[in-house]
Amino acid sequence: MDLIQRPRRLRGSETLRKMVRETRIDKSSLIYPLFVREGQGIEEEIPSMEGQFRYSVDRLPYELERLTKAGVSNIMLFGIPDHKDEVGSGAYDENGIVQRALREAKKQFPDLYYITDVCMCEYTSHGHCGVLCGHEVENDATLELLAKTALSHVEAGADMVAPSDMMDGRVRAIRECLDKAGHKETPIMSYAVKYASAFYGPFRDAAGSAPAFGDRKSYQMDYHNRREGMKEALTDIEEGADIIMIKPAMSYLDMVSEVYKATNVPIATYSVSGEYAMVKAAAKMGWIEEDRIVCEMAASAYRAGVSIYLTYYAKELARFIDEGRIG
């Protein structure tokens, strides 16, 4: 047949396929989420997230060593306190779990890059992401506490803060607080487009952050909405966000693509606990090839426009990159 264009010509060998690959993935763009908890000598597996653990501060360096050897240099820290109260005071306590973990980690592994999740839900007795007035989350009263939390993280050694609470105005409040304290160069990665998703279930088990009543639909986004997500992203950029995150990843790559096209800031996405747990469960049953699925999910996120990928599979992806299986 007289064909001028034969797309298969560029698929003829692995070398050629890699040469013309449109999406490039590098280990430096991976972020690994880590859970730190109170106690001593603790390295406990999370039942709903096989292969993921909660670490006490004294055990955290062992995992940081493993990450360093894997070539993963970016960490997102989540704290699990023993004490919880109505206003989440442990979140901004200078001797809180995240603050102590940061100081210890920075002492032993100063070359790693530490990002902290800024929210109240792990620290409040009611499990909501802010201060309550009756059964409603009081937006403006929460902003000061979020800003105090972010500042306490930075002063303990955080290189970047990532507010995940979805309160209106939180980026501005944090930016102004950090600037006033002399931290003008500390970037903010905002969970700007965070949907009220069923994919968060295993995380809430891991962090002990399930709400005691109701849900988070009054502050997290309705998953039916696209234009609202764009509004959230643009608002956070105006308030000073340096990086915009879309969360979850797999079901929201349309939003990744939309925000990527409409803005000029780096885009991140978080492949969340439910996505991880689904892959693990299906792989355990022998229904899927875990490694190939992990690579395919990551590539789809980068293809949609992300330059930063938060994933519980960061160590595995780093190995796959080294082996030439992705990237």
Residue ranges and their predicted role:
Residues 1-21:
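N-terminal amphipathic/basic leader segments beginning at the initiator methionine
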Residues 13, 25-31, 37-327:
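Alpha/beta enzyme core
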